[in-house]
């Protein structure tokens, strides 16, 4: 029986991935024009991880007028991201509110497991005061040492509730996130909100488009049939 549900945030709880693609596409064109798919390469990674991988080599900033250092340029990107997130639309994925309410009615513990940081969550809480009532715990990038696709975040989510990973379902939309859930040993429920069904199917135990018409009973049946 499913005892805990561990949700990614963007593309799983909120329909925000397309907005992030706009932001990171813009950043990619400015700093990495040689990577036309930059906004997709960074999906599921923390901000620190993005900076460490793509924004430490000073050659990246050679064309930036008034460049003073990688850390200073990273700070400028962070400031732009913070401002962008303040103005984002945080709309729930269709059917989410009914689905998570059904989970909680059946005693399923629910947590957010996200690569986003605390500042991002403060924006969420301001926009959706009811958000905290849906979740028993919110784990952000500050809570784990390894980023997705490493399973650390999902293992910590299961440990927080004192349950085995195999008694959890992890809900993800990104390739890195799906890999993290699968590596943790939890049931992997993929959402085709960011990538196509065909693309995420190999990394998922089951795929849904959104939560409309999907219930705890459906989830439990699917998990049992997969055993």
What annotation goes with each model-predicted range?
Residues 1-3, 101-104, 117-227:
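Asp-based, Mg2+/Mn2+-dependent phosphohydrolase catalytic module
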Residues 2-97, 101-106, 119:
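N-terminal helical cap/lid subdomain that shapes the substrate entry/recognition surface
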Residues 12, 16, 114, 177:
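Ser/Thr-glycine-rich phosphate-binding loops at phosphate-binding pockets of nucleotides
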Residues 12-13, 87-88, 110, 142, ...:
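A generic structural signal for short
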Residues 13, 92, 110-113, 146, ...:
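Conserved SAM-binding loop
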Residues 15-16, 112, 120, 149:
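Secondary-structure boundary/capping motif
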Residues 34, 109, 187:
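Residue-level detector of anion-binding/catalytic polar loops
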